[in-house]
């Protein structure tokens, strides 16, 4: 969060004609998820929450900043309410804020996989192709609707930056030229 605050301070030039783009990533959450490390995932989530607070504080004061929070892909781990007493102590978490709500961490894929060479790998969770959560605040956040295909985050950001025909307040068809062939993509 401190690095994000400093980056915003360095990039923010009230006299500049154009704004700035800043991407912040929680780099270790993916590693923690692959390792089935629930404590690591929770710690990374807490850290990115602090980063988001810094970005939102700036956006609220600035009034012309779009903050988008999303993931580059989903993962198989979920932290969900648990009414089952059969969950092992290792996966049982207690929330200190409400005095003991029980949560459990579940991994939605097999605890093994096969690598590109055909070798059996263990202890690594998978990336599913599911939609990812997305949240936004500020101008253009009307294009951020709660969930989207992970590849569509590009269109949200490009529209906000007004790149390649993106429009403020709506998403148009995109055309990509490959050689002499034009392909239209729905955004």
Question: Could you say what each language-model-derived stretch is?
Answer:
Residues 1-185:
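A post-motif C-terminal structural segment
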């Amino acid at each position: 969060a401190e690095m994000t605050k400093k980056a915003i301070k360095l990039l923010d030039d009230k006299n500049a004609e154009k704004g700035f783009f800043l991407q912040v990533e929680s780099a270790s959450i993916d590693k923690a998820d692959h390792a089935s490390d629930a404590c690591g995932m929770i710690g990374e989530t807490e850290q990115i929450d602090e980063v988001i607070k810094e970005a939102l504080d700036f956006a609220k004061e600035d009034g012309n900043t779009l903050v988008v929070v999303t993931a580059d892909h989903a993962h198989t781990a979920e932290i969900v309410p648990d009414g089952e007493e059969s969950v092992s102590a290792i996966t049982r978490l207690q929330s200190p804020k409400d005095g003991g709500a029980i949560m459990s961490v579940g991994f939605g894929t097999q605890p093994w996989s096969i690598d590109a060479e055909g070798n059996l790998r263990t202890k690594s969770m998978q990336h599913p192709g599911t939609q990812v959560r997305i949240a936004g605040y500020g101008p253009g956040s009307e294009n951020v609707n709660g969930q989207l295909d992970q590849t569509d985050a590009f269109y949200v950001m490009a529209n906000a930056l007004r790149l390649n025909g993106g429009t403020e307040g709506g998403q148009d068809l995109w055309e990509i030229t490959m050689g002499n062939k034009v392909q239209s993509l729905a955004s």
